[in-house]
């Protein structure tokens, strides 16, 4: 009876979290287009129903190694997802090879995907690994990820492939906030690990 009650409580928790994190149907639809790229870290902005990374110019990460906000003047649509660019030149580069410029894990925080959780990301916190773009939810998330880049990439790829890719980002996030992965660490634990690593380098 106790086991069934705990399971029911967790399932109820998922439902509550899902409702709490939806932030409106438009957000859910924006992140979950009918697309091979689903889910993506996108928002709805006017006529652009699935605007990747709030319009960040993805090409600039590769060509300038920095975050640059795109303009509605230069935009493309690829696999039912909308993209903006800071210049016609960047748009042309993207249109020639759009897959090359896609952020890994749909533009969600790469460190969140390590735990099977598609969290939002901060456009100006990123790194490039082997020519691929990884965006993070903030400097703390990036620092935690970089404690073990090979190991965290392996975990992130595992959870992205087996759980996140092709599925609804809101339900996945809610599920993994209740049913945590075996290696789960809280934000406080990760911050402590980062602080310890920095102290050891001094």
Label each PLM-derived region with a short phrase:
Residues 78-87:
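Short, well-structured hydrophobic secondary-structure segments
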Residues 8, 22-25:
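N-terminal twin-arginine translocation
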Residues 26-79, 99-202:
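Intrinsically disordered, low-complexity terminal tails and linkers in eukaryotic proteins, enriched
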Residues 2-13:
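Bacterial N-terminal signal peptides that target proteins for export
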Residues 13-23:
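Bacterial N-terminal signal peptides
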Residues 85-86, 95, 135-137:
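Beta-strand residues in well-ordered beta-sheet regions across diverse protein folds
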């Amino acid at each position: 009876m106790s086991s069934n009650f705990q399971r029911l409580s967790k399932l109820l928790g998922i439902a509550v979290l899902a409702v709490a994190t939806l932030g409106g149907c438009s957000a859910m639809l924006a992140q979950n287009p009918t697309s091979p790229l689903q889910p993506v870290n996108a928002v709805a902005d006017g006529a652009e129903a699935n605007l990747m990374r709030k319009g960040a110019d993805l090409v600039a990460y590769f060509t300038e190694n920095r975050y640059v906000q795109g303009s509605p003047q230069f935009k493309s649509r690829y696999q039912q997802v909308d993209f903006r660019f800071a210049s016609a030149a960047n748009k042309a580069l993207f249109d020639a090879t759009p897959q090359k410029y896609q952020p890994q894990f749909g533009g969600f925080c790469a460190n969140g995907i390590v735990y099977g959780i598609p969290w939002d990301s901060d456009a100006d916190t990123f790194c490039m690994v082997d020519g691929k773009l990884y965006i993070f939810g903030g400097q703390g998330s990036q620092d935690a990820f970089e404690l073990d880049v090979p190991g965290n990439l392996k975990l992130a790829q595992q959870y992205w492939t087996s759980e996140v890719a092709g599925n609804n980002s809101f339900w996945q996030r809610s599920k993994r906030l209740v049913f945590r992965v075996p290696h789960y660490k809280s934000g406080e634990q990760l911050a402590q690990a980062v602080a310890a690593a920095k102290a050891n380098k001094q």
